[in-house]
Design a protein with these regions (language model features):
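Walker B catalytic acidic pair
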Residues: 318-320
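Short regulatory helix/loop adjacent to the ATP-binding pocket of P-loop NTPases
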Residues: 139, 349-360
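Post-Walker A helix-loop "phosphate-sensing" segment adjacent to the P-loop in P-loop NTPases
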Residues: 45-57, 300-308
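Nucleotide-state sensing region of NTPase/ATPase domains
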Residues: 48-126, 130-132, 141-144, 148, ...
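A conserved P-loop NTPase coupling/switch region
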Residues: 108-115, 119-188
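Conserved NTPase motor "head" modules and their coupling/switch loops across ABC/AAA+ ATPases, GTPases
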Residues: 1-31, 173-314, 323, 327, ...
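Conserved lysine of the Walker
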Residues: 35-36
């Protein structure tokens, strides 16, 4: 699987650029704020329909333009394919095309161009808030399981509606009459998310432990624990059981949610912990331990996606190697000898020998 070429129009700081890529390593070089990360964002968005930076689609449209266009040619699933996204500066919905045919949802292009992004912020993912860790799992699962993507979208839609009910009920108490209906549906969809996440994190933890053991020489025991609502004693239980578990938890917090006007419990609060030989990295891990564990998680994510899809996903390393010491740099580079890789950096140095070099300056290829 590899991205053969991409064309960007009015995307971020790119007015119009066409790029051909190597099926192996592509080194994207240039000073800061020239468009290197924008290019990786375009590649990631092409395959997933999700941005790792923008909160709104309009943020990706070049200033002064009405629309942005991202189009790529991919060799995947043993044939050439094309993907295209048209993003609009306003409320008009985006458009998706696969092999020239218009599609309705991002789930219809899942698996064509899966990507794994690794950026400097990910090095501290085990120290930051739970939302960042949830995004790690969600990004992978949405690409692996189109049904998960649909369930997550539905869950967030219901959660938003429930939040409005809780906020507006002070002025309109009758809204509370429909709250149980929303709680039931929220728990049904939330149970699906927990079921998917439990299996994903179980596999991710086992794979990450392998990579961590290779780097540390087995000196530390890596363990990952998925954490969801307290009434879920077995996240691998049938979805019907998980639904009831979530309903029980919501019943306990029903009055508190009404009083605070907040959705206090559910899979939108999920998290995971990583420990080394029983020591929780979130609370006690050193910078070196935390970075090595984060690297292991990203390599594990790539391995899992490759195993499930039969082809390795495209790896996007956004200025992350410069944040690592030589030992960790070598460890990462030794693990990515296969598949397509994009590496951004300001000073290419020792990396120029890895593959094709593309220099970016102010949204143009030099």
């Amino acid at each position: 699987m590899n991205l053969r070429k991409i064309e960007l129009r009015n995307f971020r700081n790119y007015e119009h650029v066409q790029l051909d890529f190597d099926p192996g390593v592509n080194l994207i070089v240039g000073d800061n704020a020239q468009g290197k990360t924008n290019l990786l964002e375009g590649i990631s968005y092409l395959g997933s329909g999700k941005s790792f930076r923008a909160m709104k689609t309009s943020e990706m449209v070049r200033f002064g333009a009405d629309f942005a266009d991202i189009e790529g040619e991919i060799f995947a699933q043993e044939r050439n394919q094309t993907l295209r996204w048209v993003l609009f500066n306003g409320s008009r919905p985006r458009q998706i095309f696969r092999n020239g045919a218009k599609k309705k949802t991002a789930g219809e292009i899942a698996g064509v161009l899966p990507t794994v992004l690794f950026c400097p912020e990910d090095l501290m993912v085990l120290k930051t808030g739970a939302a960042q860790r949830r995004r790690l799992g969600d990004h992978a699962l949405c690409q692996l399981r189109p049904n998960y993507d649909a369930a997550l979208t539905e869950y967030n839609r219901i959660l938003d509606q429930k939040s409005r009910i809780l906020k507006d009920h002070f002025e309109n108490p009758a809204l509370l009459e429909i709250l149980p209906e929303y709680n039931t549906r929220l728990c049904q969809v939330g149970a699906l998310l927990i079921s998917y996440r439990a299996r994903f994190y179980d596999s991710l933890g086992k794979s990450a432990a392998k990579f961590h053991g290779q780097f540390s020489g087995g000196a530390e025991e890596f363990a990952l624990e998925y954490k969801t609502v307290s009434t879920v004693s077995d996240p691998f239980a049938p979805v019907s059981t998980l639904t009831q578990n979530l309903l029980d938890h919501l019943d306990r917090h029903y009055r508190a949610e009404i009083e605070t006007a907040q959705c206090l419990t559910g899979p939108h609060k999920d998290d995971f912990d990583v420990s080394l030989s029983g020591i929780n990295l979130k609370s006690y891990g050193s910078q070196g331990q935390t970075r090595t564990a984060a690297i292991s998680l990203k390599l594990a994510q790539r391995e899992l996606m490759g195993r499930e899809m039969g082809e390795e996903p495209v790896l996007l390393l956004d200025d992350v190697l410069s944040e690592l010491d030589p030992g960790r740099q070598d460890f990462v580079l030794n693990q990515i000898v296969s598949g397509q890789v994009f590496i951004t950096c300001c000073e290419p140095g020792r990396f120029t020998k890895l593959g094709k070099t593309i220099e970016i300056r102010k949204g143009n290829v030099i």
